[in-house]
Design a protein with these regions (language model features):
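Catalytic-core regions of core metabolic enzymes
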Residues: 1-660
Length: 660
């Protein structure tokens, strides 16, 4: 059913409207009276009139149609009210009431009953445990806020975060199209709201704060289309163990893995930020028409700010644009002899409005972002330069205003939709987020397991180490030469056939921490084989002998995330996977270009290219792609290849652990 009755209702009933002005039901009613031009119906079984309006004892007594019912009653009455809504033919409902899934099993059962009742009448429910929904046309929340009409939609899974964003929007004069507080997402899910807003002609960008995702598969299916229509920016609560625990008691959501969430946002083409200030700063870009690029020219009247900004640009992986000689020649004509025509372009501390104007005229056609920093000084004010920048709208201008009149300068630029900041580092981070936006991808998960792989893994909770190596070979992943032995003579024969030196290690049906058990011996030569076998066979009767390879040790793994499903992991291998923690995540299945990006993100690509030998990165990429499909094909719960040794001959799975 359409979400129009929720977002654009023709009539609204407030169930639980109160005569007490401190009660939520009264606040919502007064907010609607102040902002909504449609029909409003207060519902209270003990009142005849509230806030000068006729009150009805139940929804069923209302004479006209009701598009939207906002319910703010004690939770024990919520189901009864929803039954009335079904009988009345209400189309949508916002359930403000809390005390449902977020407080435990009893609340969860009540929430299920509430939603099953609503479904009988085809009622779409926002919440429960929500602050509500607000737009320039109606305030269906208990927040005291009148929003300015704008093009940014805010979707939040926290009433407190939502209230702060409303305050921020008013304080910064930021217009919004909608703010939606999702609450427990018992019915209407975040992906549905994102999809609806992506089709809304009054919304240019969507900003989303989430603590958990209701349905990972649906999210991965729906949000790529939304992100292809307009920017969708995400921030997530529950990044740490403590934060994830707080999420459970806040909205009853499963926080899931923070790193997997980030990978999911990359997959759907969203922009992911890690702190609230950057999240809100991006609003200054997404509604701007400025063509923002990752190549940056810094124009400033402060050498120190130029240095700090250059550092920030370098740390962000962005580029400082080279100034062409012809433009340098023009700049020399306006610069003092103490200033050089280079990037950052220091106009000197005595630069006034005119020097800024002359410099901007010269550099305006450079194909880059012009990051213009103004430190307010006696010879120049931020506001004066802000007015200069208005002449270069559409030329990729970003203003950074620093000084006593920075607020008025920011207002001048913002009124013209030119991105404006009061710190250059914040501007640089916003540029990085915007220019590194990934392309949306839809993940098609069709299990196509190889029959021999199915036979090998059927009915098992885990694979023995030698079975895991066989599975690698079935899927075309290289392994070192190897063999399993159970006697000294067999060990000698297998080692001779492999060639020296070899690695000898304990082997068992269950996955073992072999190194911790002192069950791995490297650099075994011919005359050592029998004695090493005797040593290892004291731990396990079965011993594995492998060809000893040299190369870069890489970690490739997989897991089944409870929210987003199968995910592939890449990072430094051996002991360094725990020490460096430079692991990149990708939602399965990944494609070769995504695998390469994962290698770059985890720094494994840099490690490979730093080697003098031509290590086979292509083989590693193909292995990552294969693993990402294997874990889907066989529904693998956990998988580690550590190490996967990469050298000039390919990528070789040395130790493999697989759990189902």
């Amino acid at each position: 059913m359409s979400l129009d009755p929720l977002f654009r209702p023709k009539s609204i009933a407030v169930v639980g409207a109160s005569r007490n002005r401190e009660k939520i039901g009264n606040i919502i009613l007064r907010n609607l009276i102040a902002t909504y031009r449609g029909k409003i119906y207060p519902v209270n079984n003990k009142a005849e009139e509230i806030e000068g309006m006729k009150s009805y004892k139940t929804l069923k007594e209302i004479p006209g149609d009701v598009d939207l019912a906002i319910i703010s009653v004690p939770r024990q009455f919520a189901v009864e009210v929803m039954e009335d809504a079904v009988e009345k033919g209400v189309k949508a409902s916002i359930v403000i009431t809390s005390g449902f899934r977020e407080v435990g099993d009893e609340g969860a059962k009540l929430e299920e009953e509430l939603i099953s009742t609503a479904k009988k009448g085809g009622i779409r429910v926002l919440g429960p445990n929500t602050m509500g929904l607000i737009s320039p046309d109606f305030n269906g929340t208990f927040a005291y806020a009148n929003v300015q009409r704008g093009e940014i939609a805010l979707v939040v899974q926290s009433g407190g975060i939502g209230a702060y964003m409303l305050d921020w929007a008013q304080r910064t004069r930021t217009g919004i199209s909608f703010l939606v507080s999702m609450g427990n997402q018992a019915d209407v899910k975040e992906y549905e709201v994102i999809d609806y807003l992506s089709r809304d002609p009054e919304t240019r960008a969507i900003f989303v704060y989430l603590e958990g995702v209701a349905d990972g598969e649906k999210f991965l299916d729906v949000v790529p289309d939304a992100a292809s229509r307009k920017p969708v920016v995400f921030i997530k609560g529950g990044a740490t163990a403590k934060g994830a625990e707080a999420v459970k008691t806040h909205t009853g959501s499963l926080a899931g893995s923070y790193e997997v969430f980030k990978a999911a946002i990359k997959t759907v083409g969203g922009i992911f930020v890690e702190d609230l200030s950057d999240f809100l700063n991006l609003t200054r870009f997404v509604t701007s028409s400025e063509p923002i690029k990752g190549d940056i020219l810094v124009v400033t009247n402060s050498g120190g700010h130029g240095v700090l900004t250059s550092d920030a640009i370098s740390r962000s992986g962005l580029n400082m644009v080279d100034i062409p000689d012809r433009i340098k020649d023009e700049l020399r004509k306006i610069l003092p002899v103490t200033s050089l025509p280079k990037n950052p372009l220091d106009l000197s501390g005595d630069a006034g409005r005119d020097r800024y104007a002359e410099a901007m005229k010269i550099v305006q056609d450079l194909d880059c972002t012009k990051l213009v920093i103004v430190q307010s000084l006696p010879v120049v004010s931020c506001s004066e330069v802000a007015k200069v920048l208005l002449n270069y709208k559409g030329k990729g201008v970003v203003g950074v205003m620093m000084g006593v009149d920075e607020d008025s300068a920011l207002r001048i630029l913002e009124s013209a939709s030119i991105p404006a900041f009061n710190f250059p580092e914040a501007a640089v981070r916003a540029i990085r987020y915007l220019t590194s936006k990934p392309n949306p991808r839809k993940k098609i998960r069709v299990a196509q397991p190889i029959s021999s792989a199915v036979e090998l893994t059927k009915g098992k909770e885990y694979l023995a180490d030698y079975e895991a190596l066989k599975l690698m070979e079935i899927y075309g992943i290289k392994t070192p030469k190897w063999g399993i032995v159970q006697s000294e003579e067999e060990a000698q024969r297998v080692a001779d056939s492999i060639g020296y030196p070899v690695v000898m290690k304990i082997s068992a049906d269950k996955p073992l921490h072999k190194t911790e058990m002192k069950g791995v011996v490297m650099n075994v030569e011919k005359d050592m084989v029998k004695s090493v076998y005797k040593q290892l066979s004291q731990i396990t009767k079965r011993v594995m002998i492998q060809e000893q390879l040299t190369g870069l040790e890489v970690f490739v793994g997989g897991l089944k995330d409870p929210v987003f499903g199968h995910t592939v992991l890449v990072g430094s291998g051996g002991i360094y996977v725990e020490v460096l923690k430079n692991v990149s995540y990708g939602i399965s299945p990944v494609y070769e270009d995504e695998a390469l990006e994962m290698l770059k993100e985890s720094k494994v690509h840099d490690m490979l290219t730093a080697r003098k030998r031509g290590y086979d990165e292509g083989s590693l990429i193909r292995t990552i792609v294969t693993v990402s499909r294997m874990i889907v094909d066989l529904n693998i719960k956990e998988m580690d290849i550590n190490p996967l040794i990469v050298n000039e001959n390919g990528a070789f799975a040395v130790d493999v652990r697989i759990l189902f």
